[in-house]
């Protein structure tokens, strides 16, 4: 399939039934099948595997696919210097394959569980982004020099900022290599991407911002059941709106092909398709459709 867009697949790390063995098997197989990238979702109060160790483990069992956090919620992780060191470590371990999608997140329970300030998360996020720039540029911090290891990618792994607020647009222009959409389909993505393009140009940034997006998929005779079961549970915090999220899952070959084409037409550079089941059959079905 020639689409002019990188097609990645999410790891099943937020599916409660997925074991560590399942996640690593999925990473190996996706790397072998030719997917451009592997993605992770992020939250605290749920039965998911934590994002940064999962990415490090995926780096160890793959050699080609990029690793994209889609997204990593950084404010409740606190110290920006430590987080910069952790991300630089994953970038080093992966040989420079890390892309860091970051945002403030919208679930208050994650902040309550970590003892961090939900209302003040934007201010913390701004400070962290500035800290990333400083640490990854090699700024001297003490008698031993800079905080290492140096990222494998010069200047640090590319940052894709998530969110649709004015602050998110500002952060993308000030600190990002681009923007990552948090779902909503191709039309919502296109609207957000156009806002970023205008702000990017107005700020005098050179080149083009990188754009990424995500969608959920399930294939096979039980596709709708798999999507409804997982997404209703994962998005239960949204109340009745969880049904809308479940209904948006791509559950047919035609729906997947259509969304891929529409995202590509809207200027998306990387689309991550996240599974609703950790069964490797789901990965093979997607590869049969997209990697041929």
Question: Language-model segments: which ranges?
Answer:
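Active-site-adjacent structural elements that line small-molecule/cofactor binding pockets in enzymes
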Residues: 1-292
């Amino acid at each position: 399939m020639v689409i002019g867009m990188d097609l990645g697949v999410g790891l099943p790390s937020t599916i409660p039934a997925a074991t560590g063995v399942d996640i690593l098997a999925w990473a190996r197989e996706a790397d072998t099948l030719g997917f451009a990238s592997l993605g992770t979702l992020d939250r605290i109060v749920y039965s998911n595997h934590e994002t940064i160790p999962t990415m490090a483990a995926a780096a160890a069992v793959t050699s080609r696919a990029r690793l994209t956090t889609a997204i990593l919620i950084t404010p409740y992780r606190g110290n920006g210097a430590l987080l910069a060191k952790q991300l630089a470590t994953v970038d080093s371990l992966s040989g420079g394959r890390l892309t860091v999608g970051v945002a403030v997140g919208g679930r208050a329970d994650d902040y309550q569980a970590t003892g961090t300030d939900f209302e003040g998360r934007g201010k913390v996020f701004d400070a962290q982004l500035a800290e990333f720039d400083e640490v990854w540029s090699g700024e001297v911090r003490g008698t031993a020099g800079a905080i290492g290891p140096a990222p494998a990618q010069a200047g640090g792994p590319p940052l894709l900022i998530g969110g649709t607020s004015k602050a998110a647009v500002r952060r993308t222009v000030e600190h990002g290599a681009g923007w990552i959409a948090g779902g909503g389909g191709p039309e919502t993505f296109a609207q957000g991407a156009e806002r970023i393009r205008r702000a990017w140009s107005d700020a005098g940034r050179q080149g083009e911002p990188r754009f990424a997006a995500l969608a959920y998929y399930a294939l096979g005779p039980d596709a709708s059941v798999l999507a409804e079961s997982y997404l209703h549970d994962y998005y239960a915090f949204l109340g009745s709106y969880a049904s809308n999220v479940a209904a948006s899952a791509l559950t047919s070959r035609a729906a997947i092909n259509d969304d891929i084409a529409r995202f590509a037409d809207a200027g998306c550079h990387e689309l991550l398709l996240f599974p609703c089941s950790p069964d490797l059959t789901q990965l093979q079905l997607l590869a049969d459709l997209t990697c041929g």
